[in-house]
Regions:
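Short beta-strand segments that buttress and anchor functional surface loops
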Residues: 122-126
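FAD cofactor-binding and catalytic pocket of flavoenzymes
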Residues: 14, 199-218
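Core beta-strand elements of the Rossmann-like FAD/NAD(P) dinucleotide-binding domain
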Residues: 105, 127-139
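Short low-complexity, flexible loop/linker segments enriched in glycine and/or proline
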Residues: 2-4, 77-81, 119-121, 202-209
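Glycine-rich loop(s) and the adjacent beta-strand/alpha-helix scaffold that form part
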Residues: 135-200
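FAD-binding core of FAD-dependent oxidoreductases
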Residues: 1-8, 139, 146-147
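A conserved short coil-to-beta-strand element within the FAD-binding core of flavoproteins
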Residues: 106-119
Length: 218
């Protein structure tokens, strides 16, 4: 991910003569999502995005001075991180977590969820070839990505996209999503798979999807 962040930030936007509001953000987000989103969740997103943006900045995440328009937003309220490919978030948030005593495990393969009395209580993880259970203190948050690299799941939940190539990393296989589902966790909107223009299968030419609408057509 490029880490683009959509949020109303009037002081920054007014420098570019951009008019905006939380209500406009809500209406556009709901509209451009085809009306399929949960209105309450969309409202929560747009009303808290500005605070989240400022919180990230307080932790050291840096954004470019100008906001841009981007696919999925259709308005100039998208904040562009200075560091590419999400590295700005990783550096700042990792540093903040370590400062607070959080233990971060890398090169750890989470293979399943661990349940006790019908409740998610941790994860099954393999580190250096050894399998162990990491217990959660309060909750388990699944943030393992999509299933875009799993052709079987794509065919099952979004059959109209079956056979498309992907530029996702192999670990976006939906493994933990399915592990949760086997334990009774409800899944929704599984057919909502984001696609971007790309090269046809078995072709080598590049198709670039530009974000800068001031210099390119998209």
């Amino acid at each position: 991910s490029g880490g683009f962040f959509a949020a109303v930030d009037l002081p920054r936007q007014k420098k570019q003569n951009i008019e905006d509001s939380v209500e406009l953000f809500y209406q556009q987000t709901f509209q451009f999502g085809g009306g399929a989103a949960d209105p309450a969740l969309v409202r929560h997103l747009v009303e808290n995005a500005t605070e989240a943006l400022h919180w990230l900045e307080s932790l050291g995440v840096r954004f470019e001075s100008d906001v841009i328009g981007l696919y999925g937003s259709h308005w100039q309220r998208v904040h562009v991180p200075v560091l590419p490919l999400g590295t700005g978030y990783i550096r700042a948030l990792s540093a903040a977590a370590l400062k607070r005593g959080v233990k971060i495990c890398t090169s750890a393969d989470v293979t399943d969820l661990y349940f006790e009395k019908g409740r998610a209580a941790g994860v099954v993880v393999k580190i250096a070839g050894k399998q162990e259970i990491v217990h959660a203190s309060r909750a388990v948050v699944i943030a393992s990505g999509s299933f875009a690299s799993n052709n079987k799941l794509v065919a099952q939940h979004a059959p109209h996209l079956q056979g498309l190539t992907t530029n996702n990393i192999p670990t976006t296989d939906g493994e933990l999503m399915m592990a949760a589902h086997r334990q009774g966790v409800a899944l929704r909107d599984m057919d909502a798979v984001q696609c971007l223009p790309g090269c046809p299968p078995n072709k080598k030419f590049r198709v670039r999807f530009h974000n800068d609408v001031s210099r390119h057509i998209y």
